[in-house]
Amino acid sequence: MLKITKFGGSSVANAEQFKKIKNIIQQDPTRRYIVVSAPGKRFAADNKITDLLYLLDAHRKYHVDASSVFKLIKNRFIEIKNELGLKQPIEKELDAFYTNLNQMSQAVIVSRGEYFCAKLMAEYLGYAFVDAKDIIRFKLDKSIDWDATSAKLQAKYAQYDHFVFPGFYGTSANGHIQVFPRGGGDITGAILAKCLHADVYENWTDVSGFLMADPTIVQNPKGITHITYSELRELSYMGASVLHEEAIFPVKEANIPIHILNTNRPQDAGTIIQEHSKIKSGYPITGIAGKKDFMSIYIYKKHMSNEVGYIRKALSILEKYHISIEHIPSGIDSFNIVVEKKEIEESLYEILAHFKEELKPDKLTVQDDLALISTVGKNMSDKPGTSGKLFGALGKNNINIVMIAQGSDEINITVGVKKKDFTKTVQVIYDTFVGGNE
């Protein structure tokens, strides 16, 4: 049995969290290869180290004195070192980092949180430190070079029984430090799990897995103990943020389960993510997630269905502006294009002008206060009447459905409602399928 064990920013925020990690590692000898993020917030008003590093880079870029920002960063690491009684000469490394700041790229600067954290963690656990820049390789198109990365990881696996590995970065095809998107430490852990053929990828954070709904909307929502990759992808895409959605693909391809666990409550069951889960939750749905601030463009044209390529023309206009499309619900003579407001706001009027000129619609309207809520669950396809029950519940609660979209795999029903009805919609769906479990 081999586990890749990744700890997020809240799990490495201070010396006390380091101690919890050591206890977790010592409880299970299969936790041999550890990935860490940069230290996160210790309390609500605190700063994440990565945020401070981005701020440090901005000061450097605009020639503003950055000494006060650097001091905050340095003190965090020294505090961890001193409280744990470590010998790592991290002060010298940090000072050298600051001295050479102007010669560094943004990627190098913002990746140092993981780098320094991994160095301290390696000493504290008595494990080897393996630098991600020597292992993870990107291609010119910024995708992972799996062959090169896997070969380098296998070599380190043969060399060390245990090591600590910094998340979030690797090396580009040109030999420079390259970072993943924010939260990319999850991706690093998934890469290690795939390349080392792990049996489980453990992802430790500050919550006990996924919940069936947002706890800021639904009071004490039930936890999700088992979920498929497909369900997770749907929920993550719509805003359920425990795991970086791009971390799913490497382990899904290798059929490796992900186990989301809580560093502060290691006894909790957490959430197991695997492609084919035989465990039934007892509910027709797995979870509910949603996002606000979408825009819907409605296009109506008489006899549209007789015009070959009519919808394609609209999509090609949006493609020219690099606009990603969320949904395209359609009828015989009309269709809606749903996009995120922030993607289209700057170019909206130009795009509408192109639509009028090239599509010559009989009606063209825009609704810009849309929220999307997805109800997700592999069990829905086995339960006739699920969508009818959902729509009926919303109607009974005077929530007007502006848009409906259902995936062909029948694990997701997405409804569009006015932004003002977002919270109420999530609550009603939860109460309908979970609160009053049949």
Regions found by a protein language model. Give the residues of each.
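Internal glycine-rich alpha/beta core junctions
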Residues: 123, 261-263
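Short helix/loop capping segments that flank catalytic or ligand/cofactor-binding pockets
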Residues: 44, 174, 212-213, 259-261, ...
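Nucleotide/pyrophosphate-binding catalytic subdomain
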Residues: 1-243, 248, 340, 416-418, ...
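Positions that flank functional sites
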Residues: 135-137, 208-209, 266, 333, ...
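Structural motif
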Residues: 2-3, 31-34, 107-108, 127-128, ...
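A conserved regulatory-domain signal marking ACT and ACT-like small-molecule sensing domains
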Residues: 269-438
